[in-house]
């Protein structure tokens, strides 16, 4: 879509609320922007009109560059091509959560709610598909004996993933996490109640993000983040706080692609007898042989089977 860039400003979308988007202009001014009608008509089942993280061109509608409100008004005219998108399935369609990121912070909790490796594995697959770095954070480690987590940490670490145990309550590894986020565009993903908002408040005191409790009846957290939002960090970079995801379904990944996205299964895929082998019940399967020989961790293979059988078949 062609626009007259000479009369437009550039900025980045911080959050989207219904028909209005908060855009931080490159000039440092915060704008409340509507979306040009022609952009809405371009929306398809594969693309949201505007999402947090989008780079946009917009027209300022404030008088002489001075707003009559706390935020200047604007009209978004064009969205730049997206990179590093994270999506999930919503009612059978792609729902883009955030765009233009280079890392995904996958936050789980050791307790309240308990850790769910299958959810971590699904998020890691999504990060690989988006070609962004997955980083695993296990929060609330003050509630358990860290020795109990060592086998799980060992599995992910052996695959080359960074794994960081943290506690927003005690401050454990918060300084390391702050350094890890510096000058990066990072999405936070995890189910409700794992402590995403608490960690952000610890990383950057003064944010004042709302913190929800975990239900003692079902061990599930309450949603405190209701829409994806970009939060600039004082030390450089930004994080995208996304709504808690209880069922993080894979988007646009076929059953035949999953093994190739798992670094521990990938080396054995080409050794199978059948090119379309799914490594479940087929004969002469190199992946199953590697599991039997303990060259592939049995828990990881079980997670692979669960992903295929529960979500992709």
UniProtKB/Swiss-Prot annotation:
Keywords: Cytoplasm, GTP-binding, Hydrolase, Metal-binding, Nucleotide-binding, Ribosome biogenesis, RNA-binding, rRNA-binding, Zinc
Main location: cytoplasm
Binding site residues for Zn(2+): 272, 277, 279, 285
GO BP, sorted A to Z: ribosomal small subunit biogenesis
EC number: 3.6.1.-
Enzyme type, top EC level: hydrolase
Named cofactor requirement(s): Zn(2+)
Coiled coil start-end: none
GO molecular function, one term: metal ion binding
Assembly with partners or alone: Monomer. Associates with 30S ribosomal subunit, binds 16S rRNA.
Job description of the protein: One of several proteins that assist in the late maturation steps of the functional core of the 30S ribosomal subunit. Helps release RbfA from mature subunits. May play a role in the assembly of ribosomal proteins into the subunit. Circularly permuted GTPase that catalyzes slow GTP hydrolysis, GTPase activity is stimulated by the 30S ribosomal subunit.
Record family assignment: Belongs to the TRAFAC class YlqF/YawG GTPase family. RsgA subfamily.
HAMAP family named among the record's database cross-references: GTPase_RsgA
Full protein name: Small ribosomal subunit biogenesis GTPase RsgA
């Amino acid at each position: 879509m062609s626009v007259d860039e000479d009369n437009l400003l550039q900025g980045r979308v911080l959050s989207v609320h219904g028909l209005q988007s908060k855009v931080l202009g490159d000039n440092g001014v915060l704008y409340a922007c509507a979306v040009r009608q022609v952009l809405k008509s371009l929306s398809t089942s594969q693309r949201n009109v505007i999402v947090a993280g989008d780079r946009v061109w917009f027209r300022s509608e404030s008088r002489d560059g001075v707003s009559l409100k706390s935020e200047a008004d604007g009209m978004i005219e064009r969205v730049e091509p997206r990179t590093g998108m994270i999506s999930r399935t919503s009612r059978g369609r792609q729902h883009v959560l955030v765009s233009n990121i280079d890392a995904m912070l996958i936050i789980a909790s050791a307790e309240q709610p308990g850790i769910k490796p299958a959810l971590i594995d699904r998020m890691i697959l999504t990060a690989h598909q988006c070609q962004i770095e997955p980083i695993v954070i296990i929060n609330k480690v003050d509630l358990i004996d860290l020795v109990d987590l060592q086998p799980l940490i060992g599995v992910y670490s052996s695959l080359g993933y960074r794994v960081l145990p943290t506690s927003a309550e005690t401050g454990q590894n918060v300084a390391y996490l702050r350094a890890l986020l510096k000058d990066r565009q990072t999405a936070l993903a995890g189910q409700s109640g794992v402590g995403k908002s608490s960690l952000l408040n610890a990383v950057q005191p003064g944010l004042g993000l709302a913190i929800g409790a975990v239900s003692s009846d079902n061990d599930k957290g309450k949603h405190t983040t209701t829409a994806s939002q970009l939060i600039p960090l004082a030390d450089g970079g930004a994080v995208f706080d996304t709504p808690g995801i209880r069922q993080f379904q894979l988007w646009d990944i076929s059953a035949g692609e999953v093994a190739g996205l798992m670094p521990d299964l990938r080396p054995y895929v080409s050794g199978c007898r059948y090119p379309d082998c799914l490594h479940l019940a087929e004969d002469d399967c190199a992946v199953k042989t590697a599991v039997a020989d303990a060259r592939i961790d049995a828990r990881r293979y079980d997670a692979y089977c669960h992903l295929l059988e529960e979500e992709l078949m």
